Amino acid sequence: MTDAAVSFAKDFLAGGVAAAISKTAVAPIERVKLLLQVQHASKQITADKQYKGIIDCVVRIPKEQGVLSFWRGNLANVIRYFPTQALNFAFKDKYKQIFLGGVDKRTQFWRYFAGNLASGGAAGATSLCFVYPLDFARTRLAADVGKAGAEREFKGLGDCLVKIYKSDGIKGLYQGFNVSVQGIIIYRAAYFGIYDTAKGMLPDPKNTHIFISWMIAQSVTAVAGLTSYPFDTVRRRMMMQSGRKGTDIMYTGTLDCWRKIARDEGSKAFFKGAWSNVLRGMGGAFVLVLYDEIKKYT
């Protein structure tokens, strides 16, 4: 293998392992966030059974579905997240070579900053094309509030993908893809761009204390998450449309979804579950720091 291939493989492995560990740790927060986001578009959750907020959700889930249900959809998330993050991190460096070749970060700061934004956004959009059906399945499994057996909408990851494919075709597995690309570019641009720029401005980036790295990463994930959150809410709502027919369809398209949420639920609805998303972001910050630490030993 060439040095470039070895470097690519190390990036892929380090990013994937770090992501899988952190995602499993914050899976309960992730499920709470998803339920709050999509409950208005769920056929299973009627108006009288909707969750009032994070606390109500955390209290009711173990009572109604069991403690292990906090990790519902986590397997799909780990399977999805491993290649997603690994591809993001690996392609990020490839895109950096394209956008940042010959750029001096000390004398060409804004060009350096713009290059980091572009490389982060392009990496996120590229990987999304490959793993979107897994992201779709993770959302639908997490939104499934049935206790067990016949009450469940899907038996598992494979069952979810097969049922939606049979009812809606490949299009059903990519429901909400367009708005996802918009959101992922905004999120990844901030996630990678600001983080790399901030670290690059430090006196000795490779020997920065892990606490400083974590603080930078935490701030970046919080800002990036809140900035792109409305796009995430719309894409999750669109994912819930797959499998519906006729009068069951709530939104005719992405623009209709934006319009109806704003009209019927108010602008605050775009940020439902946002606070739990900030908490979940601690896992994202941990990924960035852990990735840098793993690379030091590979």
UniProtKB/Swiss-Prot annotation:
The modification N-acetylthreonine is found at T2. The matrix-open state (m-state) is inhibited by the membrane-permeable bongkrekic acid (BKA). The cytoplasmic-open state (c-state) is inhibited by the membrane-impermeable toxic inhibitor carboxyatractyloside (CATR). Proton transporter activity is inhibited by ADP:ATP antiporter activity. The modification N6-acetyllysine is found at K105, K147, K155, K163, K166, K268. It is a multi-pass membrane protein. Disruption phenotype: Mice show an apparently normal embryonic development except pale phenotype, but show a reduced birth rate. Postnatal growth is severely retarded with macrocytic anemia, B lymphocytopenia, lactic acidosis and bloated stomach, causing lethality within 4 weeks. Mice develop anemia in a cell-autonomous manner by maturation arrest of erythroid precursors with increased reactive oxygen species and premature deaths. The chain crosses the membrane at residues 8-37, 75-99, 110-130, 179-199, 211-231, 274-291. ADP binds at R80, K92, R235. The modification N6,N6,N6-trimethyllysine is found at K52. Trimethylated by ANTKMT at Lys-52. Solcar repeats lie at residues 6-98, 111-201, 212-297. One of its GO terms (molecular function) is ATP:ADP antiporter activity. This is ADP/ATP translocase 2. The lineage of its organism: Eukaryota, Metazoa, Chordata, Craniata, Vertebrata. The gene is Slc25a5.
